[in-house]
Amino acid sequence: MISEPMGFYTDTTVCIGCKACEVACKEWNQLPTSVDNLLEMSGDSYDNTRRLDGTHWRHVKFIEQFSEDRSDGRWLMMSDVCKHCVRAPCLEVCPTGAIIRTEFDTVVIQSDTCNGCRACIAACPFGVIGVNLCSF
């Protein structure tokens, strides 16, 4: 019996940008908290992760909208993750079979099988895949 595909929905109208979902994703997938335990701050934003990469699989992006004099503004939150494409280009180009589709219909990279060729990075139309330097 094939399980019914499931999704992860983030209601950005109630998101406060606490990034607890980022932390939970890292914990669930056993990813390091940050490379060398340093946070990369952008200098002009509260968004400390800034992008998806090999150690950040979920990103809550802060979209900051301010008036010209910065006296009035608002934050909008946008959640970004792997799209788990039905026809996943990353899966199709992987020469070692390290990228698989699970029984839950999710696309997963098996780091123990990956040879680090980075073909998947070039193939991803959303720019989601990155290299986890801790794995190599």
Enumerate the language-model features and the residues they cover.
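Non-ligating segments of multi-cofactor redox enzymes
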Residues: M1-F136
